[in-house]
Amino acid sequence: HVCVNCAGVGSAMKTVGRENKPHDLGVFNMVVQINLIGTFNVARLAAAVMAENEPGEDNERGLIVNTASVAAFDGQVGQVAYAATKGGVVGMTLPIARDLAPLGIRCNTIAPGIFNTPLMNAAPDKVKMPLIEMTQFPKRLGNPPEYAAMVCHMVENTFLNGETIRLDGGIRMQPR
């Protein structure tokens, strides 16, 4: 049994913006609720169900795959809420894996870079091209089947536990 958590919302808002206006705390809270608390909520509920499974190979009962982002490591200007929540997802990966190990449940996280999604497809080239240029190789957006292949690898490799894997073509986001 596998649970793949893919929650993600963001906001483009600086800590202190124009006219020295502070970041809207309601917006920050909404991003935390969805990206971080929502991810933990689904993980804890899925783990409770998985704990009832009959153990399979290696006595495994399940796998939870959470989705972070390269923003967890390379948050850009205006991404404080998003980067904080995705950093939180990375930060809870190992403790969740340790908590669930006695139950035979693994937990890993994928930190994708810039992927070819409907949201990114709607972005103008002037937004997409600089992001593609920051990618080392291959110089393109990631494709959803590549994310799915990483999930499949995590399913098949039962020795992989408590890890966050960047799936990003080597991108290192610049501050802007």
Show the residue positions of the predicted features.
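Short, small/polar-rich loop/turn modules that mediate ligand/substrate recognition or access, typified
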Residues: A101, R106, N161-E163
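Alpha-helical segment proximal to the catalytic Tyr-Lys
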Residues: A48, R98-D99
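Active-site helix of classical SDR
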Residues: A43, T85, T93
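Catalytic Tyr-X3-Lys loop
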Residues: H1, V9, K21-N41, V65, ...
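Catalytic Tyr-x(3-8)-Lys segment
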Residues: V31-Q33, K126-E146
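Residue(s) in the substrate-gating loop at a strand-loop-helix junction
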Residues: S69
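C-terminal substrate-recognition "lid" of short-chain dehydrogenase/reductases
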Residues: N143-L167, R172
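Conserved mid-core segment of classical short-chain dehydrogenase/reductases
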Residues: G10-N29, A48, E52-D58, G78-A81, ...
